[in-house]
Curated annotation (Swiss-Prot):
PANTHER family for the chain: GLUTAREDOXIN 2 (PTHR45694), GLUTAREDOXIN-1-RELATED (PTHR45694:SF18)
GO cellular component, as recorded: cytoplasm; cytosol; mitochondrion; nucleus
Record flagged with keyword Nucleus: no
Disulfide bonds: C61-C64
Record's miscellaneous remark: Present with 31400 molecules/cell in log phase SD medium.
Organism listed in the record: Saccharomyces cerevisiae (strain ATCC 204508 / S288c) (Baker's yeast)
Entry EC no(s): 1.11.1.9, 2.5.1.18
GO biological process, one term: cellular response to oxidative stress
Residues found modified as Phosphoserine: S37, S91
Induction entry: In response to exposure to reactive oxygen species (ROS) and upon entry into stationary phase.
S-glutathionyl cysteine, modified sites: C61
Protein's name according to its UniProt entry: Glutaredoxin-2
One Pfam family in the UniProt entry: Glutaredoxin
Gene3D superfamilies hit by this protein: Glutaredoxin
Amino acid sequence: METNFSFDSNLIVIIIITLFATRIIAKRFLSTPKMVSQETVAHVKDLIGQKEVFVAAKTYCPYCKATLSTLFQELNVPKSKALVLELDEMSNGSEIQDALEEISGQKTVPNVYINGKHIGGNSDLETLKKNGKLAEILKPVFQ
């Protein structure tokens, strides 16, 4: 006796998408929030205020590379006016990233601050550049 199993490919796709979406939702909304010490948060706030430009990045991140290229090559921000932290090369990089999430609500890198104000990530930086607002925000950096 031969059994013939036939699956609708659309059903398989729907099941895969449902499983993927369930995993994302569970991770985002049901995960335990990470506890960041207030000492670490204060330290990160101090780091943000040390220089006019602060960027938290990771060496392998293409968006981080694009942000650094925009700031330092295209816009010629003096490196002496910036603090760039490569979180993946730091022993406490994940703690710093968690503190940045608590401070700004942004977990991803790059995480950019200019003159102590949270700018966002690479797409936010590029939008400001495209709209002509980034040059205005950076004016104090060049004074």
